[in-house]
Regions:
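Flexible assembly/topogenesis modules
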Residues: 1-135
Length: 135
């Protein structure tokens, strides 16, 4: 049975005036067999095209990966990511991903707070893929 890639669909509604939505993603126990795993932001849609929206994973320090270069090759293991979902959906990036040591739960938040424009109602749908990562 091939379960890879493991896909997660996130659907969140953000309200006007700067909303933050928190949610957890449980990582399947299958990934405990690997020391690291990769989370990839595959697709984003938003019903309000003028709204800036950000996705964050609460792990450790800020970083944004927008290159195809594999950070593990440089010996860097990213422990947090902050993605501008607006730039992603408008073709501003070809690859958004983070490599993390295995853990069973990740806490995320999505917000319209950090955008330059005031917060407006919007519904955001994201597709995340999780796959094992071997160095």
């Amino acid at each position: 049975m091939n379960i890879l890639p493991y896909r997660i669909i996130i659907n969140r509604h953000l309200y006007a005036n700067r909303d933050i939505q928190y949610f957890n993603i449980n990582i399947p126990k299958f990934f405990a067999n690997y020391k690291y795993f990769k989370i990839i932001l595959k697709d984003v849609s938003c019903d309000n095209r003028s709204q800036d929206v950000w996705l964050n994973c609460d792990a450790l320090t800020y970083n944004q990966v927008s290159q195809h270069t594999d950070p593990a090759i440089r010996g860097i293991f990213l422990e947090k990511f902050l993605f501008n979902l607006t730039a992603f959906r408008e073709g501003g990036s070809q690859s958004h991903y983070v490599i993390l040591p295995y853990r069973d739960t990740l806490k995320f938040w999505i917000t319209n707070i950090m955008g330059a424009k005031p917060g407006m109602d919007c519904t955001v749908v994201m597709i995340l893929e999780i796959e094992p990562y071997d160095i």
